[in-house]
């Protein structure tokens, strides 16, 4: 299976149904002036408002402990949701890479 790219704005959710583990890499994530929540495999992380996260030069590194690379087992779900509205998530670019490449 080839890699999959999720890009857009608003709440985002991905359920791994590949039959194998996947690596989820957040290249870009921008949150507006309200909090958002990232959830995966029983973990919940608050995503600070007004910040940009991701694997790029000058990405925010010290504002909060938001992971930008996550491993998901088959059947597990990853999501980012705005605290007050889906518009809290201004933009994202996420790549999902299957374990087998």
Predicted regions and their residues:
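Exposed low-complexity, polar/acidic, P/S/T/G-rich flexible segments that act as propeptides
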Residues: 85-101
């Amino acid at each position: 299976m080839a890699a999959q790219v999720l890009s857009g704005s608003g709440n985002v959710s991905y359920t791994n149904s590949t039959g194998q583990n996947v690596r989820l890499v957040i290249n870009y994530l921008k949150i507006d002036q309200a909090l958002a929540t990232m959830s995966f495999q029983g973990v919940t992380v608050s995503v600070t408002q007004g910040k940009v996260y991701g694997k790029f030069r000058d990405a925010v590194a010290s504002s909060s402990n938001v992971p930008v690379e996550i491993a998901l087992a088959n059947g597990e779900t990853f999501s980012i949701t705005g605290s007050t509205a889906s518009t809290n998530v201004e933009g994202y670019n996420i790549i999902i890479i299957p374990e087998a490449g």
